[in-house]
């Protein structure tokens, strides 16, 4: 199977998982990226089964609207049963690295509201230790150099992602060469740097369920 076929299979598995638990009042949190796009396309086949969605990026909002799915502001929604999103890496505890698509801050906010966070990914994303994928950090533009110096002190090698402005008007530093043995601690350390909006570690609030697309089929993992 190609990587796209694996993503498609795992996206369909996520729809199959949440669909029986949705009703006409349900609002679904939807992530950003190529795997999330497959989820949106599969979810759109059942758009009469739920009320609408909260999007974690402008790109996701446009794709949802293109399918005729109502998109709500998070501030107008009191609860989200599910948030479904992809990841760049996951460990066995379902701590994640996200943010390759630069939507990490809104993704983290929507995940924080959701009762159940379902991560969908192809099998290559499950790793023993996080950090081979560079860790994205969203930064207030004027603080970029200051934050980069602090990230070097933490052992990282930050690189400015040129030409990228987030939906919030900020910039991204991608931090290479981190061996992330304690994701919860590192997430807090980086977020404590003045000028950081948030970083791509989803460890304080990890995924609740990881659906993994493999050649043998979709595997379902809960945190160890």
UniProtKB/Swiss-Prot annotation:
Please give the catalytic activity noted in the UniProt record.
aldehydo-D-ribose 5-phosphate = D-ribulose 5-phosphate
Please give one Pfam family short name.
Answer: Rib_5-P_isom_A
Pathway per the UniProt entry: Carbohydrate degradation; pentose phosphate pathway; D-ribose 5-phosphate from D-ribulose 5-phosphate (non-oxidative stage): step 1/1
Q: Would the keyword Iron-sulfur turn up in this protein's UniProt record?
A: no
Keyword set, alphabetical order: Isomerase
HAMAP family, sorted: Rib_5P_isom_A (MF_00170)
This protein is called Ribose-5-phosphate isomerase A
This protein's species is Pseudomonas putida (strain ATCC 47054 / DSM 6125 / CFBP 8728 / NCIMB 11950 / KT2440)
Write the gene name: rpiA
């Amino acid at each position: 199977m190609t990587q796209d076929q694996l993503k498609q299979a795992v996206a369909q598995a996520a729809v199959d998982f949440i669909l029986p638990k949705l009703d006409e009042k349900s609002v679904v949190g939807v992530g950003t990226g190529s795997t999330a796009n497959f989820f949106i396309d599969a979810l759109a086949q059942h758009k009469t089964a739920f009320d609408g969605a909260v999007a974690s990026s402008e790109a996701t909002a446009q794709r949802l609207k293109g399918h005729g799915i109502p998109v709500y502001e998070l501030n107008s929604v009191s609860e989200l049963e599910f948030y479904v999103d992809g990841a760049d890496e996951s460990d066995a505890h379902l701590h994640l690295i996200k943010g390759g698509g630069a939507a990490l801050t809104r993704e983290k906010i929507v995940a924080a509201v959701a009762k159940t966070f379902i991560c969908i990914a192809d099998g290559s994303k499950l790793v023993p230790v996080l950090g081979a994928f560079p860790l994205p950090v969203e930064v207030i533009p004027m603080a970029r150099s200051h934050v980069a110096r602090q990230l070097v002190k933490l052992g990282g090698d930050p690189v400015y992602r040129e030409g990228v402005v987030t939906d919030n008007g900020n910039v991204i530093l991608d931090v290479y060469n981190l061996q992330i043995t304690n994701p919860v601690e590192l997430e807090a350390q980086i977020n404590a740097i003045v000028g950081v909006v948030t970083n791509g570690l989803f460890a304080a609030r990890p995924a609740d369920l990881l659906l993994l697309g493999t050649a043998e089929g979709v595997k379902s993992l809960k945190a160890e």
